[in-house]
């Protein structure tokens, strides 16, 4: 569906050149929700502008839905952009138009007849859950409702791809989850390919099938979301994952417990997928002469399955603890020893 081949984008500035996207190659499959995550300045927004043809790469190829976006011009470029919907962080609605009129706007530009246009707008209003609000103006809507209008407008021309540029960054957590649920529903109903730009790992965890991590204009890591959560390779990826599963207050709380356990060890157990549903602690206590104390834990659901972290204290003879840890690892659970007082 989307292919980037050795794409580079260099901007010329007064004090020299700036490489915003640096030799990026990427494959995004048809019908998947693909996340691109990175901190500010990583090159994410430039990358999304390359996908919709608002920017041309300095070198490399960008192919979207069979069209080489580096070569198309004029009418063909306008046609290509109609097949690429986009939603924004700050909604970009026309404040003098109602919900209905905002959604109809791209259809007017495309020259769709009025009767067909009205029918399509009605379908979209129902799809995004705005029935009863079609005659309201943007100033009368909540942030979540404004973004629903933005999503409906982006879908007006039946695009093959939906680009989301920090689409939930301006929303509160509850509204963010509602918008993410809507995107998942649209993906399932329409088979739409969604590319999502964000700096929030929560967004990636909740709805994405695969993820690419950007830093300094480069893709430094990519893969299925559960795999990246289970085995992050790059320091930046580890920071993103750690922020989600082990916030600073958790780390401080665990470190304060070290003095309370003068023997045994404290370990972090990471469960992914099917392993998160197994009665692991029960089996460890049954099979080995160790005492297990659960200090803290959390299980989250990703778009692909469960992901959990458990902090435990194990006490007993050294060889029994070692055997227990070996057993845990053989159950496809990652083990990291946080504190060893044996």
Curated annotation (Swiss-Prot):
EC primary class: translocase
SMART domains per record: AAA (SM00382), NIL (SM00930)
Signal peptide, first to last residue: none
A GO MF term: ATP hydrolysis activity
Keywords: Amino-acid transport, ATP-binding, Cell membrane, Membrane, Nucleotide-binding, Translocase, Transport
Domain ABC transporter: 2-241
Family matches, as InterPro entries: AAA+_ATPase, ABC_transporter-like_ATP-bd, ABC_transporter-like_CS, ACT-like_dom_sf, MetN_ABC, MetN_ABC_transporter-like, NIL_domain, P-loop_NTPase
GO annotation, cellular component aspect: plasma membrane
EC number per UniProt: 7.4.2.11
Protein localization: Cell membrane
Reactions catalysed, as given in the entry: L-methionine(out) + ATP + H2O = L-methionine(in) + ADP + phosphate + H(+); D-methionine(out) + ATP + H2O = D-methionine(in) + ADP + phosphate + H(+)
Predominant cellular place of this UniProt entry's protein: membrane
Record flagged with keyword Membrane: yes
Binding site for ATP: 38-45
Membrane topology: Peripheral membrane protein
Role of this protein: Part of the ABC transporter complex MetNIQ involved in methionine import. Responsible for energy coupling to the transport system.
Assembly information from the UniProt record: The complex is composed of two ATP-binding proteins (MetN), two transmembrane proteins (MetI) and a solute-binding protein (MetQ).
Similarity comment: Belongs to the ABC transporter superfamily. Methionine importer (TC 3.A.1.24) family.
Protein's recorded name: Methionine import ATP-binding protein MetN
